[in-house]
């Protein structure tokens, strides 16, 4: 399971769409849980002239609440076939209300989010599928840095974690936070263009 996190406008949804398009171009189908309201125009730009054909190979869920997101995640396993090559959840945390206090609602929300991520991790392992989740950030007052929402549960389950950062007008940086075999801190700059990430 791969987690991609970053502030708003850092390129998370662009990356998720581009991964889905490339997966379809390689002959596989995609299951895509969209909580970010993908722009059809942006999808057409990234997918190119075959956008309609590519879109037919992407199974999209568009939940409107955390509960609907949970239902969509649970529905995924019924759709698994040898044609599925990628599962995307963009964003896993948009309906999740991050609360620093430990009230009962906050604890329940954390547990439900952990259950969803754990379920996706189980599907990834069982069916040998790639699962990509995008994640939002919060500002950690103690360190003065942006950190992914969801805490250590999502971090532990994610085998690869990539942070996307804004570095300028249209330019971004992808920084490796966690990987099994590559050193942390490795970074690559890229641009967001009409055709996707370059």
How would you label these PLM feature ranges?
Residues 28-29, 56-57, 83-86, 124-133:
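Loop/turn-to-beta-strand initiation segments
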Residues 43-45, 99-101, 144-146, 176:
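Short amphipathic alpha-helical segments
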């Amino acid at each position: 399971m791969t987690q991609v996190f970053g502030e708003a406008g850092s390129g998370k949804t662009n990356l998720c769409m581009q991964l889905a398009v490339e997966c379809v171009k390689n002959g596989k189908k995609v299951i895509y849980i969209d909580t970010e309201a993908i722009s059809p125009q942006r999808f057409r730009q990234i997918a190119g002239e075959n956008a309609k054909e590519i879109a037919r190979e992407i199974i999209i869920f568009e939940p409107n609440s955390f509960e609907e997101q949970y239902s969509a995640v649970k529905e995924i396993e019924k759709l698994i076939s040898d044609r599925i090559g990628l599962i995307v959840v963009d964003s896993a945390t948009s309906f999740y209300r991050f609360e620093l206090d430990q009230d009962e609602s906050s604890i329940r929300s954390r547990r439900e989010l952990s259950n969803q991520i754990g379920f996706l991790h189980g599907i990834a392992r069982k069916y040998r599928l790639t699962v990509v989740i995008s994640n939002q950030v919060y500002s950690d007052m103690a360190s003065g840095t942006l950190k992914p929402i969801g805490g250590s549960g999502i971090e532990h389950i994610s085998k690869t974690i990539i942070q996307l950062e804004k570095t300028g007008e249209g330019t971004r940086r992808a920084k490796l936070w966690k990987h099994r075999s590559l050193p942390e801190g490795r970074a690559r700059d890229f641009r967001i263009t009409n055709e996707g990430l370059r």
